[in-house]
A protein has these predicted regions:
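Short, small-residue alpha-helix embedded
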Residues: 148-149, 213-236, 240
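Short pre-catalytic strand/loop immediately N-terminal to key active-site residues, enriched for Gly-Thr
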Residues: 16, 202-217
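Conserved phosphate/ATP/ADP-binding segment of small-molecule kinases
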Residues: 120-203, 234-237
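Charged C-terminal helix
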Residues: 237-276
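Glycine-rich beta-alpha junction loops
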Residues: 15, 42-44, 86, 112-114, ...
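Conserved N-terminal subdomain of the carbohydrate kinase-like
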Residues: 2-120, 267-275
Length: 276
C-alpha cells in the first residue's frame, strides 16, 4: 500500500506575478510528493521585490476562520511552515496554528530583511513578533540579515562562515534547529553557503559556487526543498545540501539576461528535483 503524502500548512503570501512565496513553494513541495495547504497571509499582484507597489488583498478574519475550519474537519498537518507576514499581528495566526496542531513539525522562515536592511513596509514591532514566533518553532531559516535582526546584532555586510556559525549557535537558544542562509564571505567570496546548528549538537556548513546573478524567490525555493526533504526522512544537513544544490540548478536553468526580479525559471528545473 502506498503511504499517504505528508501534508504541510504553508502560511505565506501569494504573489500573482513573479516566482516567489507560495507560487514556488506549492510546486516544489508537490514535486517532492508533499501535499500543501496554502494559507495566504496576503494576496499580491506581484512579489514585493523591485516590481513597483503591488495591489494587495488582505482579509484579517480569513486566516483564523480557515484554521478553525481545518481543525473541525480533522485535517492532520505534519508540518506548519510560515514565511512572510503582512504585519506583526499575523504572528498570532501562526501561533494559533501551532497550538491547534501541537505535534506538527514547526518551521519559521523569519522574513524580515536582506542585504543588511529591514524590508521596507515592515514596522519596528515585526522583529520582536518574529522573535517570539521563532521561539515556538522547531526549525528556523533566517538569512544573515535576519539572524542579526533576531539577535540584536549590527546588520552585516559580507560576513564570514565563522561569524554565521556563531550566530547560528546563539540562535539555538531561540529554536532547537537553525539554518542561516546567504553566507557570502566564503572562500574569498567565491562561494555562497549556509550554516546549520542544533541545540546540543555540532554545527555544519554547506557551500556552492557563488553565482553572479541574484534572483528573487530563491530563499523560498531553498526553504521549501529543505522542508520537503526533512519530511521525507532526510537529516537536516542532507536536506540543506539538497536544497542548496537545487537552487544552484534553478539558476543554471535560467538563461543569461533573464529578468532577475521575476525569479528563476523553476519550471525548467522541477524535473531534476523529481529525479533526485
Amino acid at each position: 500500500m502506498t503511504n499517504a503524502p505528508k501534508t504541510v500548512l504553508a502560511i505565506h503570501d501569494l504573489p500573482g506575478f513573479g516566482r516567489a512565496a507560495l507560487s514556488v513553494i506549492v510546486p516544489v513541495l508537490s514535486t517532492l510528493s508533499v501535499q500543501t495547504v496554502a494559507l495566504p497571509t496576503a494576496v499580491l499582484s506581484t512579489h514585493t521585490g523591485g516590481l513597483g507597489t503591488p495591489a494587495k488583498l488582505a482579509n484579517p478574519g480569513y486566516g483564523p476562520a480557515a484554521l478553525e475550519h481545518y481543525h473541525r474537519l480533522g485535517v492532520k498537518f505534519d508540518c506548519i511552515y510560515s514565511g512572510y507576514l503582512a504585519d506583526a499581528a499575523q504572528a498570532k495566526l501562526v501561533e494559533q496554528a501551532f497550538e491547534l496542531w501541537p505535534r506538527a513539525f514547526k518551521v519559521v522562515d523569519p522574513v524580515l530583511g536582506d542585504g543588511g536592511r529591514l524590508y521596507s513596509g515592515l514596522g519596528a514591532d515585526m522583529v520582536p513578533a518574529m522573535y517570539s514566533l521563532c521561539s515556538k518553532a522547531d526549525l528556523i531559516v533566517p538569512n544573515v540579515t535576519e539572524a542579526a535582526l533576531l539577535l540584536g546584532d549590527p546588520l552585516p555586510g559580507v560576513g564570514s562562515a565563522e561569524q554565521a556559525a556563531a550566530q547560528a549557535a546563539r540562535l539555538t537558544r531561540v529554536a532547537p534547529q537553525v539554518v542561516v542562509t546567504g553566507v557570502t564571505g566564503i572562500g574569498g567570496g567565491r562561494y555562497i553557503g549556509c550554516v546549520g546548528a542544533a541545540r546540543g549538537g555540532e554545527g555544519y556548513a554547506v557551500k556552492t559556487p557563488l553565482q553572479p546573478r541574484m534572483f528573487h524567490g530563491t530563499g523560498d525555493i531553498f526553504a521549501a526543498v529543505l522542508v520537503g526533504r526533512i519530511l521525507r526522512g532526510n537529516v537536516p544537513q542532507a536536506a540543506v545540501q539538497a536544497a542548496a544544490a537545487f537552487v544552484a540548478e534553478c539558476i543554471r536553468q535560467t538563461p543569461e539576461g533573464a529578468d532577475e526580479r521575476l525569479g528563476v525559471w523553476l519550471e525548467n528545473a522541477l524535473p531534476k528535483l523529481r529525479q533526485e
